[in-house]
UniProtKB/Swiss-Prot annotation:
It is an enzyme of class 4 (lyase). Its EC number is 4.1.1.19. It comes from the Archaea. Belongs to the PdaD family. One of its GO terms (molecular function) is arginine decarboxylase activity. Keywords: Decarboxylase, Lyase, Pyruvate. InterPro entries: Pyr-dep_his/arg-deCO2ase, Pyr-dep_his/arg-deCO2ase_sand, Pyruvoyl-dep_arg_deCO2ase. The modification Pyruvic acid (Ser) is found at S52. This is Pyruvoyl-dependent arginine decarboxylase. The gene is pdaD. Its cofactor is pyruvate. It comes from Methanococcus maripaludis (strain DSM 14266 / JCM 13030 / NBRC 101832 / S2 / LL).
Length: 164
C-alpha cells in the first residue's frame, strides 16, 4: 500500500515499474488521449515523461494505488488518428538484464496498425537495445493496446515508475 504522506526526492530512483495500456475515443485529440489514460489507470496522475531506462533491481508489479495528482515518472507511447475506421496501436516493453546490477530498458512504439505488429516491434526494439550494449536479456515483458477509430481515437501504452 502506497502512503499518501510518503515523500521521495526527485533524485531517488523509483523501485517499481508497472506496465499499463488503454484506448480512448472522443470528439478531439486531447480528450481521446485523456480517455486512454483513464482506461489505463493513470488518468488522474501528472505524468513526467522520461527516457527509457528502468532503474536496476526495480520490481515489475501491477499498478499500485498512487495518490491522485502525484508526479509519476513515465515512459509512454501513443497514437492518435482522426480517420474513422483506422486502427491505431501503442506498445511498451521492458527488457530485464541477467546481471541485476545493470539497468533495464523500456521501449515504446506506436503505429497505424494492429496490436500484434506493435508488440512484436517494441519487443524487437528492446532486444536491439541490449545488443547495442552487449548485455544479456533475462526477460522481456510487454503490453500493447489497439483501437479502431470511431470519431477521434487514441491507443496508449506506458511504463509508470513508482516506489514501494
Amino acid at each position: 500500500m502506497i502512503k499518501s504522506s510518503a515523500i521521495h526526492s526527485p533524485f531517488e530512483a523509483p523501485n517499481t515499474i508497472s506496465l499499463v495500456a488503454g484506448t480512448g475515443d472522443a470528439n478531439n485529440p486531447l480528450n481521446a488521449f485523456d480517455m486512454s489514460l483513464l482506461k489505463s489507470g493513470i488518468g488522474n496522475l501528472n505524468l513526467i515523461r522520461i527516457s527509457s531506462i528502468m532503474p536496476p533491481k526495480a520490481d515489475i508489479i501491477p499498478l499500485p494505488k498512487i495518490p491522485q495528482g502525484s508526479l509519476v515518472p513515465t515512459a509512454y507511447g501513443y497514437q492518435i488518428s482522426e480517420i474513422k475506421g483506422e486502427t491505431v496501436a501503442a506498445g511498451i516493453s521492458v527488457a530485464i538484464p541477467k546481471d541485476k546490477e545493470l539497468c533495464g530498458l523500456i521501449m515504446e512504439y506506436e503505429c497505424i496498425g494492429g496490436k500484434k505488429e506493435c508488440e512484436d516491434t517494441v519487443r524487437n526494439m528492446a532486444k536491439e537495445g541490449f545488443e547495442m550494449r552487449g548485455w544479456e536479456i533475462d526477460e522481456i515483458i510487454s503490453i500493447a493496446s489497439e483501437h479502431t477509430v470511431e470519431n477521434i481515437g487514441c491507443a496508449f501504452a506506458a511504463a509508470a515508475l513508482w516506489y514501494k
